[in-house]
Amino acid sequence: MDLTEAEDIKKRWQEYTEELYKKDLHDQDNHDGMITHLEPDILECEIKWALESITTNKASGGDGIPEELFQILKDDAVKVLHSVYQQIWKTQQWPQDWKRSVFIPIPKKGNAKKCSNYCTVALISHASKVMLKILQARLQQYINRELPDVQAGFRKGRGTRDQITNIRWIMEKAREFKKNIYFWFIDYAKAFDCVDDNKLWKILKRWEYQTTWSGISISFRIFHSLLWSTQSKALA
């Protein structure tokens, strides 16, 4: 049935996003006590780097603060953000306002009357983006040590061309030695939207315990706080 009333359309989008992003979270691994050592505080130089790395001309999150404001305020913005991030660092908890995001549906090819034919883009606070950029940089140096050499996606300095070269080499060797070779090309529907947070956290915990990840324990706890309490709403 086609929906024509604005309220009905909004309700349908709410139902769709709730189903798409529903979480059955368990094993929250609540930590006792606070970590007060092992990982250095957020530095102002990290904030400056993150601000310079973030793409401009992006829509604001729920707080309505544009990224360009940080560029205008420059050092004053760095000092304010540093004060906020230090508070997050001390409490090891992600701010409640930053746990809320707004989804904007962007139409793709196909029937525009189906919610599944839209790409949902999340609008989050620019201040939270800066903090996430810093946490990502800290975690990335450890993650890169654990990833296998065969993975090229989402890795700096590697890409599709590397994998194409590898595939051609494998095909040539298979032909040379007269061996059968099989390739699987998998396109997951809503791949990023359907990541299992429980499994993601389980993998991260295993890496933390088995490696020298104790040096970023506070980053882990803050990430854990964000992962288990994110809230979203859709704007149709």
Predicted ranges, named:
Residues 188-236:
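Conserved polymerase palm-domain catalytic core
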Residues 1-117, 122, 126-130, 147, ...:
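Surface-exposed loop/turn segments and immediately adjacent short secondary-structure elements
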